[in-house]
């Protein structure tokens, strides 16, 4: 357990240091390339050296289909009530006048970037590489919506939210913890990062579009 703790947090801490140094000394263009590269390359390198399989990607059409189905169902469950709650939040907390439909391209245009440059690298590292290590340290003890979960699931979500603040501090970064729980759940539900990658990208693109409806 001690070895896993040192390895998981040591690798993550080193990764964040490298990303922070890149932010300080590289241009935004190169920094934008560094982040997904490290998030993909470091776990790939470690797993290759340890001769461990990359078992969190789809290995069959059936598994891919399951991931796509779980993603679609999760969107239908999560986003309608979230959108309704967020709408009233914008009206009564931020005191915007009303909802004014923004162009739908604001949602679709960033989707390829969100999938390939944001969601895939982040889910590859945090849900594919880190979360299984956390689950070995803290064995899943709870059964939630058909999935065995534990403190490893929660710790991974906390580290994910904290990592965003290390790179760029924002007051609302604490809220990243909550969708991270969904990402982690989807990974455990399907055994693959397909559903969390798609849900992650959809969430980011959706929020970019949603807030524009009030500005």
Give the ranges of each region predicted by the language model.
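Residue-level signature of transmembrane alpha-helical entry/exit and packing/kink sites
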Residues: 4-8, 12, 32-36, 63-71, ...
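Alpha-helical transmembrane segments of polytopic integral membrane proteins
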Residues: 15-19, 47-51, 82, 122, ...
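Juxtamembrane helix-loop-helix connectors linking adjacent transmembrane helices
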Residues: 25-29, 54-121, 136-143
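Alpha-helical transmembrane segments of integral membrane proteins, especially early/N-terminal helices
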Residues: 1-4, 29-41, 65-84, 134, ...
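Transmembrane helix-loop-helix hairpins at the membrane interface
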Residues: 107-215
């Amino acid at each position: 357990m001690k070895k896993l703790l040192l390895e998981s947090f040591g690798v993550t801490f080193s990764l964040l240091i490298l990303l922070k140094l890149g932010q300080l000394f590289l241009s935004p263009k190169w920094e934008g390339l560094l982040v997904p590269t490290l998030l993909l390359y470091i776990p790939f390198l470690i797993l290759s050296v340890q001769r461990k399989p990359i078992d969190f990607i789809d290995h069959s059409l059936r598994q891919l289909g399951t991931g796509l189905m779980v993603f679609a169902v999760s969107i239908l469950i999560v986003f309608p009530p979230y959108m309704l709650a967020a709408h009233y939040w914008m009206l009564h907390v931020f005191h915007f006048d009303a909802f004014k439909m923004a162009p739908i391209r604001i949602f679709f245009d960033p989707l390829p970037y969100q999938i390939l440059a944001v969601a895939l690298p982040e889910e590859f590292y945090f849900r594919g590489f880190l979360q299984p290590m956390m689950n070995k340290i803290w064995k899943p003890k709870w059964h939630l919506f058909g999935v065995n979960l534990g403190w490893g699931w929660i710790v991974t979500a906390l580290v994910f939210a904290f990592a965003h603040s290390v790179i760029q501090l924002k007051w609302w970064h604490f809220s990243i913890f909550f969708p991270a729980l969904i990402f982690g759940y989807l990974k455990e539900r399907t055994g693959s990062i397909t559903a969390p990658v798609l849900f992650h990208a959809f969430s980011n693109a959706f929020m970019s579009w949603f807030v524009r409806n009030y500005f």
